[in-house]
Swiss-Prot record:
<keyword id="KW-1003">Cell membrane</keyword>
<comment type="similarity">
    <text>Belongs to the metallo-beta-lactamase superfamily. Glyoxalase II family.</text>
</comment>
<dbReference type="InterPro" id="IPR017782">
    <property type="entry name" value="Hydroxyacylglutathione_Hdrlase"/>
</dbReference>
<dbReference type="GO" id="GO:0005886">
    <property type="term" value="C:plasma membrane"/>
</dbReference>
<feature type="binding site">
    <location>
        <position position="253"/>
    </location>
    <ligand>
        <name>Zn(2+) 2</name>
    </ligand>
</feature>
<feature type="region of interest" description="Disordered">
    <location>
        <begin position="31"/>
        <end position="57"/>
    </location>
</feature>
<dbReference type="InterPro" id="IPR035680">
    <property type="entry name" value="Clx_II_MBL"/>
</dbReference>
<keyword id="KW-0496">Mitochondrion</keyword>
<dbReference type="Pfam" id="PF16123">
    <property type="entry name" value="HAGH_C"/>
</dbReference>
<feature type="binding site">
    <location>
        <position position="176"/>
    </location>
    <ligand>
        <name>Zn(2+) 2</name>
    </ligand>
</feature>
<keyword id="KW-0378">Hydrolase</keyword>
<feature type="binding site">
    <location>
        <position position="172"/>
    </location>
    <ligand>
        <name>Zn(2+) 1</name>
    </ligand>
</feature>
<keyword id="KW-0479">Metal-binding</keyword>
<dbReference type="InterPro" id="IPR001279">
    <property type="entry name" value="Metallo-B-lactamas"/>
</dbReference>
<dbReference type="InterPro" id="IPR032282">
    <property type="entry name" value="HAGH_C"/>
</dbReference>
<feature type="binding site">
    <location>
        <position position="291"/>
    </location>
    <ligand>
        <name>Zn(2+) 2</name>
    </ligand>
</feature>
<feature type="binding site">
    <location>
        <position position="177"/>
    </location>
    <ligand>
        <name>Zn(2+) 2</name>
    </ligand>
</feature>
Length: 385
């Protein structure tokens, strides 16, 4: 009987949440339209035009972010252009790096390495909530760094492990993922810097395309093109077959535990296609994200899908971890399919919660993309409690 009462209560709460979500979306849409009108009036009434940073190409979309801890917290197209295309962005990153080192001298989270048969994955907490990674061939003593934003922290881990850094894999150009490329590549003369040529990766030496493979010792790492967060965003898939273990996905800012990255340089359709790329991987694939966003993301997932018991169980585990400042990564893609709303745009429960969309639903790409965009709007407005 208690279970029946609880289920009934959850169902009622879900209906209330659906009404609230539709109201928020309506307000957000109206506010966005008002902002667009204001910008149009300002552009026509301005007596003179000052030199502006080089804008993003017309087909790209920038969605402002509400205030938060992420280095991308400042909003606006002009700021994004400055952050990614000028020295001001680098100086801002250096300021964030100094502050994080002072606040978290031992890192923002306590991490645990994963050991396989001759392979070690070591998460390195950097900045206020980022993760860099060392992927180590323990027999050859060779290491690959993923998104080494703090060269000091990454170098300390390299020395502690007693390995030789031979490659840097950069998921995208943002300084909180690429800021350590220069120092580490200079310190390790044989180190190659891999990334997308579309993304202006600092100190890039070896451009990668979709499905290219980087081989280091027994490490076989495949690059997958996943544009949306940036034009040239890549994720990296470590093949588990050579070491007879699970494959590992280093997802940068594409996919987080119960969340996904914001669409700074693309459309909802682009981001949906990129998410579908990783959805095609196996359920046992380990997800190593670029940020520690688990608790906030699961809180939002509970707003849009309050009856999801998998989300509730994961949230309880995450809260226990974070009370002790323990890292929440990795999760698995199988887990993410069960509670991550950005991977569940095909689910009827989300379609009902966010309201009807024009045209067919289900597997139709356009309608799923529209649902993804609505989820993103809500996530940007969401404040965890």
């Amino acid at each position: 009987m208690a279970a029946v009462v609880a289920a009934t209560a959850l169902k009622g709460r879900g209906a209330r949440n659906a009404r609230v979500l539709r109201g928020i979306l309506s307000g957000a849409t109206a506010n966005k339209a008002s902002q667009n009108r204001s910008r149009a009036l300002q552009s026509h009434s301005s007596p003179e035009c000052k030199e502006e940073p080089e804008p993003l190409s017309p087909e790209l979309e920038y969605i402002p972010r509400k205030r938060g801890k992420n280095p991308m917290k400042a909003v606006g197209l002009a700021w994004y252009s400055l952050y990614t295309r000028t020295r001001l962005g680098y100086l801002f990153y250096r300021q964030q790096l100094r502050r994080a080192r002072n606040r978290y001298p031992k890192g923002h989270s306590r991490t645990q390495p994963r050991l396989f048969n001759g392979v070690k994955v070591l998460p390195i907490p950097v900045l206020s909530d980022n993760y860099s990674y060392l992927i180590i061939d323990t027999q050859a003593r060779l290491a690959v760094a993923v998104d080494p934003s703090d060269p000091q922290a990454v170098q300390a881990s390299i020395e502690k492990e007693g390995v030789n850094l031979v490659a840097i894999l950069c998921t995208h150009k943002h300084w909180d993922h690429s800021g350590g490329n220069r120092d580490l590549s200079r310190r390790h003369q044989d180190c190659r810097v891999y990334g997308s040529p579309q993304d202006s990766i600092p100190y890039l030496t070896h451009p990668l395309c979709h499905q290219d493979v980087v081989s280091v010792g027994r490490l076989q790492i495949r690059a997958l093109a996943t544009p949306g967060h940036t034009q040239g965003h890549l994720v990296y898939l470590l093949d588990g077959e050579p070491y007879e273990g699970p494959s590992c996905l280093f997802s940068g800012d594409l996919l987080f535990l119960s969340g996904c990255g914001r669409t700074f340089e693309g459309t909802a359709e682009t981001m949906l296609s990129s998410l579908d790329t990783v959805l095609g991987l196996g359920d046992d694939t380990l997800l190593w994200p670029g940020h520690e966003y688990a608790e906030e993301n699961l809180g939002f997932a509970g707003v849009v899908e309050p009856e999801n018991l998998a989300r509730e169980r994961k949230m309880q585990w995450v809260q226990r971890q974070r009370m002790e400042r323990k890292s929440t990564c990795p999760s698995t893609l199988g887990e993410e399919r069960s509670y991550n709303p950005f991977l569940r745009t095909h689910c009827l429960v989300l379609q009902e919660a966010l309201g009807p969309s024009p045209g067919p639903t289900g597997d139709d790409g356009c309608s799923r993309a529209q649902l993804l965009e609505r989820l993103r709007q809500l996530k940007d407005l969401h404040k965890s409690k």
